[in-house]
Amino acid sequence: MTVRLPRKSPAGRGCSSISPAPSASRSVSTSEHGTARRSDVIQPRGRAGTCAALALAASVCGATARAQLPPDPAGTIEPLPPASPHWVWVNDVAFFAFPDGRAFLVDGDSGKMLGMLSTGYSFTGVVAPKARGLIYSPESYFSRGTRGTRTDVVTIYDATRLVPVGEIEIPPKRASVMPMPGAQALTDDDRFLLIYNYTPAQSLTVVDTRSRKFVGEIEIAGCALVYPTGPRTFFSICGDGALLVTTLTDEGKVARSARTAAFIDVLNDPLTEKGVRRGDTWLFASFEGVLHPLRSTPTGVEADPTWPLFTPQELTQHWRTGGLQHLAVHGGRGRLFAIVHQGGPETHKDLGEQIWVYDLVSHRRVQTIAMRNKVGSIQVSQDPRPLLFACSLENNRLDIYDATSGKYLRSVDPLGLTPTVLVTP
């Protein structure tokens, strides 16, 4: 079938109008010498021929229009606006896609996701220094995706553009554990990044953030995790109920390491490892709901008097703390936030539907905040008008509340796959 195409428009762009094809059975053409001759090619007849001509012409016009479009820009990265105290990092271990850990940056005021980091296998969480210019992320990768040679690194991200700007290779020993706040931490001056290892021998990797080099490994046999107490000091919790207090030199080597007395009754009422810090004091809750303040001193760590989170009547009603990150603190207001639920012994990982708020001076509950969804992780911003962030492994969403009134504000839903630890910059 032969179809006459429309002429090009005078300007050379776009498409001209299309007239119906003639219904003659034969067409007449002119030879190169100008002699008219009859063509043996059959022309399309009637409405069918017209439709075919229109379709072909339209396709040609579409191709012409596409060719005239300017190319889309690629590789453009928009910098973030100035950081807000209401931003929060939502770490996602991605249980259903384990090699593909992620960290999402969310603006609590707008409920919008500002950016995302791809953070590798068995991801435990990012670390945000006080200076806010960079983000540190301990990560693991395998040469064949889910197998092959393992490489552990600390990836350094620009906190404004969320792009990698450096990488420090570390020994492939980083603990592949359920994400928890104590798995990695910076010393108080942001100089050294400490990363918990479990092979099953327990140790800490030390990274100098100034020189961007691996410094060495510190043995913490029988103890776990890392809780900073100063520019060069931190402690780990030991299996016998004691603490291992370590002091570093300016080169990141061990200057002093000593065990305290056993502060914790590990047989009758052990602590969870999910502590929160206010000033020089770390606060830990026991399985039975007793709060243990551990205060750093120039010579080590001392245990201040404990106090109960639950009254005897509440204990008979089986109220317990529980969750993956079940405590949060607002330092300025002196408030402790705790996820609670009703359950029996060994339910310290269960999700909760309420947040109980305590005054850290009077040791009394002053507020109860009902959650819209069961939650396992909470975090509170540290500004004068704080937000309360809440999420859980079971619901890939982030709920946001006014931390003062307890009023629900908004949700980011969905968000990731299995959100875990929350970090405020």
Where are the regions a protein language model picked out?
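A short beta-strand motif characteristic of beta-propeller blades
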Residues: L69-P71, K112-S118, V163-A175, K213-I218, ...
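Short coil/turn segments that connect the beta-strands within blades of beta-propeller domains
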Residues: S84-H86, A131-G133, D189-R191, P231-R232, ...
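Short glycine/acidic-enriched loop and turn motifs that connect beta-strands
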Residues: A94-A97, Y141-G145, P200-A201, G241-L243, ...
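Loop/turn-rich, solvent-exposed surfaces of beta-rich toroidal or solenoidal domains
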Residues: W319-L360, T368-D383
